[in-house]
């Protein structure tokens, strides 16, 4: 039985073919909502970054068998799937000179509060960030991506994000401290040296709070993120929501791993959220908003005012 379903050109068994994907839209039970729809988008010719989906069945087995056994069973399939993404992106996961970075997202059958937040830019470390700088000629982009990754990974995988509104996110406190010292108001006003300082302070906070160094190995980072998705299925908030909505625990969640596409490379890149229908009326009206030189959750986080995609 396949535990990993690939998207992009070909599948986990490296079959070739433009616009091919193992999954499709009606496979939400196995691939989750995101995984099934990403596969369908690929099949109809939408340019979707290559990646793969670890199925919902693995989540169930993870909760029954435990982390160690499931990771051992999955290891070969995931490494094979990563190798296929490397081939398609002409880059290598964890490589210093030509790095492949990925995103990791949860993907239940239906959107569900309490599930793991997205992790972007996975695969960076102190050496890879220098390689990314050389590869792109853009030091600010490389270090901005790195500081975002350490914060996301620390918050989500290492459990450093506050669970209530009274507690302060240690990473946000550091950002505010550095911005105040620099005399700026916005994150995108920070310069390369400021971003390097953020990374250094972020990693020190990780060491202080967890007692361990921030993981430098790309595969260690990946397995940490994958297991965090599965663990989030059984967290208190997710369990409570499932009880309220009569969603069985056995459904599980899928994990989606995709090659990164960057919105923070400068004034010619952006991140956005869009809808094919009006959310209030259902009218066939394309709408959404975007932020230039930003990434991920910036659009909905209220850091800067986004622009309307239809203007």
Task: State what each model feature region is.
Residues 11-311:
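Nucleotide/phosphate-binding sheet-loop regions of phosphoryl- and nucleotidyl-transfer enzymes
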Residues 1-13:
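Single conserved hydrophobic/aromatic residue that forms the stacking wall/gate
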């Amino acid at each position: 039985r396949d535990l990993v379903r690939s998207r992009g050109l070909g599948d986990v068994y490296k079959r070739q073919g433009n616009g091919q994907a193992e999954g499709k839209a009606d496979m939400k039970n196995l691939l989750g909502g995101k995984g099934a729809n990403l596969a369908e988008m690929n099949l109809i010719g939408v340019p979707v970054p290559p990646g793969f989906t670890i199925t919902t069945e693995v989540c169930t087995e993870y909760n029954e068998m435990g982390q160690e056994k499931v990771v051992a069973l999955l290891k070969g399939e995931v490494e094979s799937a990563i190798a296929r993404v490397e081939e398609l992106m002409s880059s290598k996961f964890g490589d210093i000179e030509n790095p492949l970075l990925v995103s990791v997202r949860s993907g239940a059958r239906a959107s569900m509060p309490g599930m793991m937040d997205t992790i972007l830019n996975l695969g960076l470390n102190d050496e890879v960030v220098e390689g990314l700088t050389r590869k792109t000629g853009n030091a600010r982009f490389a270090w901005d991506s790195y500081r975002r990754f350490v914060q996301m990974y620390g918050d989500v995988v290492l459990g450093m994000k506050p669970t209530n509104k009274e507690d302060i996110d240690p990473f946000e406190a550091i950002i505010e401290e550095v911005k105040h010292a620099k005399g700026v108001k916005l994150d995108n006003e920070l310069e390369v040296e400021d971003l390097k300082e953020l990374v250094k302070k972020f990693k020190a906070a990780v060491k202080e709070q967890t007692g361990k160094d921030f993981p430098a190995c790309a595969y260690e980072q990946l397995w940490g993120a994958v297991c965090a998705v599965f663990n989030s299925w059984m967290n208190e908030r997710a369990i409570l929501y499932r009880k309220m909505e009569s969603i069985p625990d056995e459904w599980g969640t899928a994990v989606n791993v995709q090659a990164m596409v960057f919105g923070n490379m400068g004034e010619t890149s952006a991140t956005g959220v869009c809808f094919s229908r009006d959310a209030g009326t259902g009218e066939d009206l394309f709408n959404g908003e975007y932020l230039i030189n930003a990434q991920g959750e910036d659009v909905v986080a209220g850091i800067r005012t986004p622009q309307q995609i239809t203007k």
